[in-house]
Amino acid sequence: MYKRQTPEEALAILSNNQNDKQKRIDTVLQEGYPSYTTAAGWLGYSDEKIIQLCREYMAKGWKHFKIKVGLDLDADVKRLELIRKTIGDDCFIMVDANQQWNVEQSIKHINAYKKFNLFFVEEPTSPDDVMGFAKIKKEVGNVRLATGEACGGRIMFKQFLESGAMNICQIDSCRLGSINEIITVLLMAHKFNVPVFPHAGGVGLCEYVQHLCMIDYILINGSKNDKVVEYQDSLHEHFIYPVSYTHLTLPTRRGG
């Protein structure tokens, strides 16, 4: 890893953010950290249910909606048209294909979605195919590609970042295995100027992720601009201090 980021470079990043660290702590205590919802557009939902859920989540304050795609291009376009009409142009749409396509299919589908001004496209193809992602990126222009939830260590992230194949880094705090490995990836992503949007689609991951996005914002990256973290409304009732809607909050109690 020293070829990509030396200990001295990592220390410099952490040191440079010390001066206004308290200001960022105060900001997240007051405002929280913005999130996006994955609940409005699962595959198999009827048009009526999608409209209902989009309106419900907009009423709760969400502006970012992640939609599942990948089974049928025409059906995907129809659903995206419906969602864009429902949420308007002031809200954001991102799509997740869950590795449904090969490289050529990915290029075809993503180019067909461009008119919807997508916030990002997540996992269009195999999460191990770094060169495939690089080819997709070359062919789809300024559409941002998000991946990383299936990466089990910093070396995979190194390859994605070095190749320019990853525009949004989606760490998964369980697959990476330790906070030390996570911080290594956060520092590396910052060096490559790639924002980190942690994956949180699992039991307890939202509760873990709220700590990680605060670490990234307060100590490493120093900015929340154009960033959101995944929120999935799943089994939060089993936690003493569950995460809140729309903006994840800085824990104020032990175990929070």
Model regions and ranges:
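Short, charged helix-to-loop "capping" segments that act as catalytic/coupling loops
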Residues: 43-48, 140-142, 217-226
